[in-house]
Amino acid sequence: MTCCQTSFCGYPSFSISGTCGSSCCQPSCCETSCCQPRSCQTSFCGFPSFSTSGTCSSSCCQPSCCETSCCQPSCCETSCCQPSCCQISSCGTGCGIGGGISYGQEGSSGAVSTRIRWCRPDSRVEGTYLPPCCVVSCTPPSCCQLHHAQASCCRPSYCGQSCCRPVCCCEPTC
């Protein structure tokens, strides 16, 4: 299997044909059950697949990707690979937090911290009425960061909440 260094919306995918398609991941992220194509109806680790064109592309993922080593938001149940495996993203242009992806030294220890674009879903998929966007973060963002603190992010398909609440899921009562 051949993999590229590009990821789709911050989430790795791979080419089952053994060649690099429009969205491939680094070899460390590649697993046989990860990111199968052909369906925009399924979700990736609880989040809808994202397509900039609004149609199903080769980058759509199935939930089985959540069972193996993939980069994913913190609200997913499975423990997956380190964020460093998704250094490049094709999320799009608009970003909700931060101005872009940067790589540099942070903190007194001098450790390198990699900032990643994590995509929130396309409104055409889940009816959130929010445009596709990215959150730039060194760590997987919270549901509210991804969804601009909208009540819709309390949906089970987003954060694993048991029900939707009329108030924002960032509030303590959620």
From Swiss-Prot:
In the hair cortex, hair keratin intermediate filaments are embedded in an interfilamentous matrix, consisting of hair keratin-associated proteins (KRTAP), which are essential for the formation of a rigid and resistant hair shaft through their extensive disulfide bond cross-linking with abundant cysteine residues of hair keratins. The matrix proteins include the high-sulfur and high-glycine-tyrosine keratins. This is Keratin-associated protein 1-5. It comes from Homo sapiens (Human). Keywords: Keratin, Repeat. One of its GO terms (cellular component) is cytosol. The gene is KRTAP1-5. Expressed in the middle/upper portions of the hair cortex, in the region termed the keratogenous zone. Belongs to the KRTAP type 1 family. Residues 3-172 are annotated as: 15 X 5 AA repeats of C-C-[QEPVRC]-[TPIVLE]-[SRHVP]. The keyword Repeat applies. Disulfide bonds: none annotated. The keyword Repeat applies.
